[in-house]
Amino acid sequence: MKKEGTLCSKEEKKEEEKLKEIIARYIRGNEKKANIAKDRQKKLEKLLSEKVEVEKKNKYTKFKINIKYPSYSIPISCNNLTFGYTEENLLYQNLTFDLIRGEKFLIVGENGIGKTTLLKLIMNILTPLEGSINISEKTLIGYYAQEHDLLNKEKTIKENFSDSGLTDYELRRFLGSFLFTNDDIFKKINILSPGERSRVALAKIALSGANTLLLDEPTNHLDPMTQLIIADTFKDYEGTMLVVSHNLEFVDNLGIERMLLLPSGRIMYYDKNVVLHYELLNEEVDKN
């Protein structure tokens, strides 16, 4: 049996040749034929652009994310955290949980309930009203923020990895794991699409050697195929991972073990139905 990809490739090739033939035949004809040629030219350009994108993703080579050294058994511990932007409107009270070395831990809850805020508390960007956060001595954190603060937006992708220690060949191969190819690396960050910036930021974290990752909505701006590729890259990560996401397909492929529900503070084993509930709930809120 022929593979589906092979069949699609042959059909696309036939369509491409057909469009080229029509364009060549009609391009110098009367106005009606010239318009037909222009229409087919647009279809051909769309077909070729989609072909390039598929080829780009098919060239993906999986990269193993290494850690510099393991953390202690409890890399991060949150004890009786209470926080709110005003004391009259608290996001959570007496929130307590430990991260266990090597686990993938998910935070879920309605939009605006304080998921991103919790990561900022752990990173000491914000200060709790009460309680404490203990980061063990050997915990090396890689933090993916939605703002992409790690990136120098005036420099190229390649220049943002100038301290990586990789040769040009190694860097190109590594960035291929995040779907960057050929001359992509010479693009400045400030001209990249939101999805491309996300991939650069995730690549920076993957190369950092961190043994504990905090990922805040890492699939925002990524198309479904790219989300699966990123999940495939991070699922074999041997460190500890704390993720904020309601993207069911992404977290399901990531291999989440436990979940924290906000604002209740309830901790439970991974349940895809709970993630689906919040995914649908937040989609509905975003529409209104």
Please describe what each predicted stretch is:
Residues 1-5, 64, 68-288:
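ABC ATP-binding cassette signature C-motif
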